[in-house]
Amino acid sequence: MPLNLPLSALEQHDEFIGRHIGPCSTEMATMLTAIGADSLEQLIDQTVPAAIRLPADLPLPAPRREHEALADLKAMASKNVVNKSCIGMGYYDTLTPKVILRNVMENPGWYTAYTPYQAEIAQGRLEALMNFQQMVIDLTGLEIANASLLDEATAAAEAMTMARRVSKSKSNRFLVDANCFPQSIDVVKTRAAYFGFELVIGNIDAHKDGDFFGALLQYPGDNGEVRDLTDVIAGLKAKGTTVAVASDLMALVLLKSPGAMGADIALGSSQRFGIPMGFGGPHAAFFATREAFVRSMPGRIIGISKDARGNTAYRMALQTREQHIRREKANSNICTSQVLLANMAGMYVVYHGAEGLRTIAGRIHRLTAILAEGLKRASVNLLTKQFYDTVHFDLGARAESVYNDALAAGYNLRRVSAGVLGISFDETTTRDDVATLFKLIAQTTLDVATIDAQVAAADSALPDSLIRSDAVLQHPVFNTHHTEHEMLRYLKSLQNKDLALDHSMISLGSCTMKLNATSEMIPVTWPEFGGIHPFAPRDQAVGYLEMITSLTEWLKTVTGFDAICMQPNSGAQGEYAGLVAIDRFHASRGEEHRNVCLIPKSAHGTNPATAQMANMKVVVVDCDENGNVDVADLKAKAEEHKDDLACLMITYPSTHGVFEEAIRDICAIVHANGGQVYMDGANLNAQVGLTSPGFIGADVSHMNLHKTFAIPHGGGGPGMGPIGLKAHLAPFMADHVVQPTGDANRVNAGQGAVSAAPFGSASILTISWMYLAMLGGAGVKKATQVAILNANYVAKQLNAHYPVLYVGKNGRVAHECILDIRPIKAATGIAEIDIAKRLMDYGFHAPTVSFPVAGTIMVEPTESESKAELDRFIGAMIAIREEIRQIENGVWTADNNPLKNAPHSQADVMDAEWKHPYSRQQAVFPLPWVAANKFWPSVNRIDDVYGDRNLNCACPPMEAYAD
């Protein structure tokens, strides 16, 4: 390196670009030569239609070095005020066990994995999710649970639609207890409007004899009241009502379960099991029901099956319920959920165990009882009579001064109504907190020890009929790992069973498994971000709001939109928020009848599932032989439905991995017939810096921050799916009933929410902020260019072995490519799933299987993979093709070969008798480099049919693990 470089070069402000992008300049040159392109710019010219290319580079800030970006974000974080939160309302401060913080939340072996569709290399997190399900089953008293939903409010909305599916009642009315959390009521209102349900919100006692298809109750209630709902539930069910109870897992450690009271569904948030509040998330919602309703339950379910050796193995059960298969007939559009957070919550319970949880839950209740008893003795008007952790009290004219005094002392109380305040306690609450708050309220001191002794000796604040009597959390997993050594080793043992980005590339098409840089992840753990309640006073969240505003402006620049709504917690939820905005727009113009949604047949399964959630009629548009939207068919159907056309949902580049030349014409056709264009942002990673949805002609689009903008997939969540909107749709995006997301005079102020928190999972927005801050305008454009280069390199190298199904007019693919396996299957019986399983033996996760075309695999390498890693993957795929040739040539039989027997486990190679026509080395070390970094699948191929026919979604007994 010459010593006379200018200082600007030595400062390396663009250093992170080289850290994020896999190939170096020399490797890029080699790859460009291999694909027949003179330069990166020429490749892009050959790939992206000139008509949609941006005329100038993105006006984003210059890139920052990692430590500079961290310092800038830390300066924002320092503007947040972390008071002790006593607001409650479903969000509570908590203590994350450090062994879980370090070894799960901060561990790329856990947070960079994908949804466990390839179960043989995901046994660790599948077991962890089974623990979560077992914990939920035990505490709710129901028979089956899913592996998480997005948040409590959307879980409540899902409960309503599930109730409609399973209820035998002919009523169109749904009862909502007025004592539910207001944010849950708000989201349920939004969802109900698009299903045409009549919502009845009120006192449940006044309506318990009414005619409803479903009901939503809260236990404990929003006001803290704990009541036995057994009789109410029995009365409702006698008339055919399906009853859902929103509850609190910590409270259920002590309280009678919803299942014991007769509930059909139980739901809520697992946040207080070790997950920081994070200004609203991310947090894993739980959802449980009766076994009879399992096929109608939304979300993913982990079940038990057996592998080819007959051993117990975990897998995702009943996948035919999901949106990617059933499309508009799916139970829900749920795709991303909250797997990482569910695993953390489950591990919190594993670590503390039943006894530890009872101690924590008992302490919370005792401190609340001490405060309540003190307030009663001080003649404070206590409004909550039977409580777990929350009390409301009427102070009349003194309420405002007490509220402000508490703020000054570092406590956030809840303003309930004029003169009424609320206090909720959590596991961080101390004796000193109780004494301080009592003095602020009663203006005298409290002898905590004396009151404690008296409360302990007296009758409980809860009647015996409400105290849990059944034993819970008895499975050995909840009673074994209580020392840190044991917990650490348990977590490590699970991690060792999973393949994540810390081992090798994950080339899942349409999933964008790029680098999740350590520097991007660090701020998520800062207490200045984790300790903020979503409904805290806005002047305590100045740093958050500054970060969100900054990210909003950057995303507007990147996408070409005029406004951003940060509320959706996933891409699928972003789709829903976008279609809701479109519907509200049409309604504002007196065109409520516009309800037809055009969707290409190649679309993601979430698109039709979301359209039906928004009460739209799906009309499928054909594709031509090249995989592009059939423009003539689109035009004919748009004109046929022009009086009722609401929108087109389209992915760009297409799900076939090609930049369609006619995209602007497609948008124009829809607009000419009165519709709006919704662009699915799943493939935005091929657009950034080169074009944008807004520039192309879309009216609204979601951005998968967990794809394009570096939030990790977490093994199936968290994610974020904010939407960008053009100015005419901006007034119709979601707002929030508790904490408005914008100015009070904004047109959409008060419009129904789609998520529980105003800014969704706000704490992980810091990841995308760091990503954009460190890459800058030049970096994000380079990332897109290299993503396209890597995909074309893979396509070129593999095309002779597996034909690339679709290419653009110049023979290029976008950021992903589809490899056609159908000729191989016709000749040998080897299917795409066999190739997927065999890749495990080479140390790779499979690409996307049989989407968007059955009998194919779709490869998306992303910009973050080096040429060396791409070459290893290419080498593995070519080696597998040569193995298939051995079957074609009759060397191996169609039913006994390395592909049909894949994956191979350590147990296989240790068998005394080897019954295969290929060697043990061929089975597990098929290429020389595999042995140096061997990943061992912990089970053999799993029997999916057996798992669904013998459904078991609870933790197996320990005997199941015996040899």
UniProtKB/Swiss-Prot annotation:
It is an enzyme of class 1 (oxidoreductase). Its cofactor is pyridoxal 5'-phosphate. Coiled coil: none annotated. It comes from Dechloromonas aromatica (strain RCB). It comes from the Bacteria. The keyword Disulfide bond does not apply. Gene3D superfamilies: Aspartate Aminotransferase, domain 1, Type I PLP-dependent aspartate aminotransferase-like (Major domain). PANTHER family: GLYCINE DEHYDROGENASE (DECARBOXYLATING), GLYCINE DEHYDROGENASE, DECARBOXYLATING. HAMAP family: GcvP (MF_00711). This is Glycine dehydrogenase (decarboxylating). The glycine cleavage system is composed of four proteins: P, T, L and H. GO terms for biological process: glycine decarboxylation via glycine cleavage system. The glycine cleavage system catalyzes the degradation of glycine. The P protein binds the alpha-amino group of glycine through its pyridoxal phosphate cofactor; CO(2) is released and the remaining methylamine moiety is then transferred to the lipoamide cofactor of the H protein. Keywords: Oxidoreductase, Pyridoxal phosphate. The keyword Methyltransferase does not apply. One of its GO terms (molecular function) is glycine dehydrogenase (decarboxylating) activity. The modification N6-(pyridoxal phosphate)lysine is found at residue 707. Its EC number is 1.4.4.2. One of its GO terms (cellular component) is glycine cleavage complex. It catalyses: N(6)-[(R)-lipoyl]-L-lysyl-[glycine-cleavage complex H protein] + glycine + H(+) = N(6)-[(R)-S(8)-aminomethyldihydrolipoyl]-L-lysyl-[glycine-cleavage complex H protein] + CO2. Belongs to the GcvP family. InterPro entries: EF_Hand_1_Ca_BS, GcvP, GDC-P_C, GDC-P_N, GDC_P, PyrdxlP-dep_Trfase, PyrdxlP-dep_Trfase_major, PyrdxlP-dep_Trfase_small.
